[in-house]
Structure formats: structure tokens, C-alpha cells
Design a protein with these regions (language model features):
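ATP-binding N-terminal substructure of ATP-dependent carboxylate-amine bond-forming enzymes
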Residues: 1-164, 168-170, 174, 181, ...
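ATP-dependent carboxylate activation and anion-phosphoryl transfer catalytic cores
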Residues: 2-5, 11-15, 34, 183, ...
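Solvent-exposed alpha-helix faces
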Residues: 26-27, 243, 325
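Hydrophobic beta-strand scaffold residues
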Residues: 39, 157-158, 186, 216, ...
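ATP-grasp fold ATP-binding core
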Residues: 179-180, 208-227, 249-263
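Rossmann-like NAD(P)H-binding beta-loop-alpha module
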Residues: 181-220
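Phosphate-binding site of ATP-dependent enzymes
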Residues: 230-322, 347-352
Length: 406
């Protein structure tokens, strides 16, 4: 019998999408092929503490009260600082070190035990050796390149895009610049800093109104799952929308609306899978139950209707799938991404690239697994393929020389 690969599933995190991550991770943990993988759940609280074993399970189930009580009591069996161990990595302490040298608090990296291999093929967490990490983390400190940088420093194989792709895929402003450079069609937009909005609100609104017509969509540049997004139909609604978005990021993106007064833009989605030769799924469409596909519509409501495959012409389908792969490559992504589009409901039916999501939702109602299911890749096989892609990408990286030969 072949030896099982040891996979660490990370979830939670310091993000406005913490709860979404818990839902996604629960689905992955339920569906992953246990005949091939030995799975270790790894939780990260909203405060950034790392949890393993029963504490990770409590976090996943939403029962953080038990975790919190044990943390406050200093239970020696609790692992809030679940050590991510690997040879050659120095100890990294949180901004405020624990009061005692051996106190368990915050996140800590430390050299691993001597049996840990030096070739970057394995890491250790809380005494367990792991071959690959699957960060089912959405939003800040999970999908934005920060934790990917940690994995890169430790030489650990992991699912999803690298530091560059993850950070570019999280920042809607940078993402749009890359799309424009690749000559991919995007909607008109304005980028505004929170500092400028707070310093000169009138000037900021004038800048937006000079460039765009109402309605507009106001978004935090670095957040997903439609958190903090508002649709503003006029100046009266624009101010509160900017204030809301500024709670979640220092940079805001304001986009022109697509569609007419009576008909909304069509929202199309494509799932992309692969590394250097990515493949696109069938095209899907979301028909929101609300005015637009916001956080509640995505995760809390049953009003939105997914249509798979989307009702498009052959030419439109081909165009959208090709644009999805082009966007994936433009942002230097790997592993997986969901690519979102807006299509004019009338007139020329122009199609605009909206954004990429480097770690799309994996809940039971999420489009990414549904799109691949419709393309012929079952959920369990999809998870297996993502882990294989992570190992392939890691093996490719080991071919790179990082030091100068004397």
C-alpha cells in the first residue's frame, strides 16, 4: 500500500472572511480522499493564534468559547502557538513577546527536530510531519501573499498561487493594472486612498463623479467575498459607501456600473485549474436574488440562482474561457482561481473582466467546485488534483538556484 501524503488544512485567519473560511474548510475536510491523504486540521483564530488538535476542531465548529477559556487559563495542552517547524528557520516572535521564555502565545517559528529533512519536502506542526499545506484561507493574511511568504521561507509545498500571484490577485487596483497591461477589457474605475477620502471628502467625490457616472460600485481594494462592497446610485449614497469600504482597507476601488436602468449586468464565472498550462471550466452565471451578488447573497441567502452552463453563444463561451486563462497568466497564478466577468445585458453584450479569486469559496454552494463538477471533475478528485499541483509546483521550484556558485 502506498504511503499516504500528510496534508495540513489551514482555516480561519485574521480576516473579514474568517467565517467563510470555516465553511470552506469543513467542506474540504469532509470530501478529501482519506485513502490517499492523512489530514491534520490547523486553525487560526481571528486574533492570529494557531490551533491544532481539539482546539482546531472547536474553531471549525464555531465553538470558540472552549478555546478562549483554555487560552485564558493557560492550559498546557492548548496549542495557540502551534509551532510551524522547519530546519534553518529562526524563531519569529509576535510584536509583544510572551512574558515567560516558554509561554505559549502568538505565532512562532522555530528550528525543527533533527529528524526533519532539509530538502524542503516535509515540515512539522505540533509534532506531526506534513508533506503539503492546503491554506483554505480567504481574504487578508491568508489569500494575499502573507502566509504564502511564510511557506516559501520554510520551503513547504502548498496549494494555490505564490506570493506574487496571491498579492496581485487580492489587490483589485494592481490586478486591474495587470489586466490592462495584458489588453484585457475592464470597466472604468477610480482608485482612492482612505487617507485622501478622510482628508478631503468633497474633493474625492468630485474626482469620482468627474470620471464615472452613477451607479457605481465601491469596494475595498484588498478583500473578497463581497465584504464591504456597496452600490451607490447617487452622491448621497456614495459617501456612506466610501466610509464602509474604508473600514476594510486603506485603498478603495470605485467601478462604473455595467448595465442599463432596467436590466442588470450578467455575472459570469469560470473556474481555472493548473500551473503553467491552466485549463478553464465551463462558464457559469450567477443570477443574484438581490440588486447585486453581495456577501449575504453568496453565503447566507438562497435567493441567488447559479446557472451552469451559462446561456451564451459558442463564440461568447470561447471568449470568456480564453479571457479566464489569460487573466490567470497575467497575474502569474497557479493551482486554482475563479475568474469573474460582467456582461452587458443589452446592446453589444460586451464582456468585461471583473476580478480573479485565488482561493475561491469551497462551500457546498460555491461556484468553483460546481463549475468543475459540471466540467467532469468531481469534488473529491478536484481536491486531489490541487494537492498534486502543489507538489508539482514545489518540485519545479527546487530546480531554481538561489545562491551564486563560487
Amino acid at each position: 500500500m502506498a504511503k499516504k501524503l500528510r496534508v495540513g488544512i489551514l482555516f480561519g485567519g485574521r480576516s473579514g472572511e474568517h467565517e467563510v473560511s470555516l465553511l470552506s474548510a469543513a467542506s474540504v475536510l469532509n470530501a478529501i480522499d482519506r485513502s490517499k491523504f492523512d489530514v491534520t486540521p490547523i486553525g487560526i483564530t481571528k486574533q492570529g493564534q494557531w490551533l491544532a488538535a481539539a482546539d482546531a476542531s472547536n474553531l471549525l465548529e464555531g465553538d470558540q468559547s472552549a478555546v478562549a477559556r483554555r487560552l485564558r487559563a493557560g492550559d498546557p495542552d492548548t496549542t495557540p502557538g502551534a509551532k510551524l517547524l522547519h530546519d534553518g528557520i529562526p524563531t519569529l516572535f509576535p510584536p509583544e513577546p510572551p512574558p515567560a521564555p516558554h509561554a505559549k502565545a502568538g505565532i512562532q517559528l522555530a528550528p525543527a527536530a533533527s529528524e526533519t529533512r532539509l530538502d524542503g519536502q516535509s515540515t512539522r506542526l505540533d509534532g506531526k510531519s506534513l508533506d503539503v499545506l492546503f491554506p483554505v484561507l480567504h481574504g487578508t493574511f491568508g489569500e494575499d501573499g502573507t502566509i504564502q511568504g511564510l511557506f516559501e521561507l520554510a520551503g513547504i509545498a502548498y496549494v494555490g498561487s505564490g506570493v506574487l500571484g496571491s498579492s496581485a490577485g487580492m489587490d483589485k487596483d494592481v490586478m486591474k493594472r495587470l489586466f490592462a497591461n495584458a489588453r484585457l477589457p475592464i470597466v472604468r474605475h477610480v482608485t482612492l486612498l482612505r487617507a485622501d477620502w478622510e482628508k478631503s471628502p468633497r474633493k474625492s467625490i468630485a474626482q469620482i463623479e468627474a470620471a464615472l457616472k452613477y451607479p457605481v460600485f465601491v469596494k475595498p481594494a484588498n478583500l473578497g467575498s463581497s465584504v464591504g462592497i456597496s452600490k451607490a446610485h447617487n452622491r448621497k449614497e456614495l459617501g456612506p459607501a466610501l466610509t464602509l469600504a474604508s473600514r476594510y482597507d486603506r485603498k478603495l476601488v470605485i467601478e462604473a456600473g455595467v448595465g442599463g436602468k432596467k436590466r442588470k449586468a450578467r455575472e459570469l464565472e469560470v473556474a481555472v485549474l493548473g500551473n503553467d498550462s491552466p485549463q478553464a471550466s465551463v462558464v457559469g452565471e450567477i443570477i443574484p436574488g438581490k440588486e447585486f451578488y453581495d456577501y449575504e447573497a453568496k453565503y447566507l441567502s438562497e435567493g441567488s440562482i447559479p446557472v451552469i452552463p451559462a446561456k451564451l453563444t459558442k463564440a461568447q463561451t470561447k471568449q470568456v474561457r480564453e479571457m479566464a486563462v489569460a487573466a490567470f497568466k497575467a497575474c502569474d497564478l497557479s493551482g486554482l482561481a475563479r475568474v469573474d466577468f460582467l456582461m452587458e445585458p443589452d446592446g453589444k453584450h460586451r464582456i468585461f473582466l471583473n476580478e480573479v479569486n485565488t482561493m475561491p469559496g469551497f462551500t457546498q454552494i460555491s461556484m468553483y467546485p460546481k463549475l468543475w463538477q459540471a466540467t467532469g471533475v468531481p469534488y473529491k478528485d478536484l481536491i486531489t488534483r490541487l494537492i498534486e499541483l502543489a507538489l508539482e509546483r514545489h518540485a519545479e521550484k527546487t530546480r531554481t538556484t538561489y545562491t551564486r556558485d563560487e
